Amino acid sequence: MYDRFGPLECANGSWVIGDPNKDHLRFEQSGMSHWVGGVEAPLVPWKAFTDMRIYAAATRLGNSKGLAKTNEIMANLRGASVSGGGPAHLTAHLRNGRGDWQAVFSHHARWYPPGEIRILSRFLGQVTERGEASRLGDPAWVSAVVEKLGQLPRGLPRAHKGAIGQILDDCR
């Protein structure tokens, strides 16, 4: 049984993105909460989400703000530009003119397999694009989906979209 998948983890019966002892996102029945410094920010209701993606490096070092800044400075010295790097975060587009939303989360001490990060991001994108984000508030449903996501081959990114769609259909 899978109790974690990339930065997604089941902690005390709830699914969270990020280290649950630090800054993280929590899947609640009515929406997603963002915990920063032990304080809960206002919950974003599931019906507000139209798209969702996750950005995380395999290791904490890859999500280091200092390393990202150093890379940016070095690239600028060479006359180049850099995109990416920085803290692990989830981005989403919200309905009703609320625009883009971004929430930073703390990287676990453990390594995230890059294939799991890609699959998780595609899963979150597809579930929101289908208008089914509210399902993320059901821990049993998320557990069933994560179990099936864990069976997907990590090295075939083109096949993931169809496979994830089939998993979502099967777990209705």
List where the protein language model places each region.
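Eukaryotic intrinsically disordered, low-complexity regulatory linkers and tails enriched in Ser/Thr/Pro
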Residues: 1-24, 35-41, 53-172
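Short, solvent-exposed coil/turn segments at beta-strand boundaries
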Residues: 23-32, 47
